[in-house]
Amino acid sequence: RNISKGVTGFSEMCRTMGAVPGAKTIKIAIEDPTEKDMELMHITPDKKILVLERIRYADEKPVLLEINRFPESFSFLFGENLNDTSLYDVLQNHNIIFDHSDKTLDIVFASAQEAKILGISKGYPLLRIESTIYNTDCSLVQRCKQLCIGDKFKFTI
């Protein structure tokens, strides 16, 4: 089941692999935008963004740290239970439909904080996937950075 053309979420990928997806919210906050947020979301420094960080699990094992950045209009997410659920399903229930995304992939090494969150050693290689996700009007809906333990999860892009 594709919830939108060209964009596949973590939960859907897990199910396709025969794994049970899970999620634990570790942060949800309204913050000042970064320069990149302002550039991609076409917002000014006086605007705010919503930041959502979650640990993603496959069969109850941590495999990915997910950092999502949304326009402040997504503050309705504060009222949602975002643990053990598909974020894309939650957004779809709010009539937010994804159309396409741009992705950049590279290898990075886990910081002490990332290593602690994911249960790995500092310096462990991670696959970093940075995505900008757009709706059918080609408006940016979400920026997402995923740090994936490459030997524990396989991405289909």
Where in the sequence are the language-model features?
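Short, well-ordered beta-strand segments enriched in hydrophobic/aromatic residues
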Residues: E53, E66-N68, C138
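HTH-adjacent hinge/linker in prokaryotic transcriptional regulators
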Residues: R1-V51, I67, S75-D102, D106-F109, ...
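Hydrophobic beta-strand positions
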Residues: I55-R56, I133
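C-terminal regulatory/effector modules of DNA-binding transcriptional regulators
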Residues: K61, S73, E80-N81, Y88, ...
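Hydrophobic residues on conserved beta-strands that form the core of alpha/beta folds
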Residues: T25, V51-L52, L65, R128-I129, ...
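Generic secondary-structure microfeatures
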Residues: R56, R69-E72
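Short, solvent-exposed beta-strand/turn "edge" segments of beta-rich domains on protein surfaces
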Residues: M41-D46, Y57, P62, G119-S121
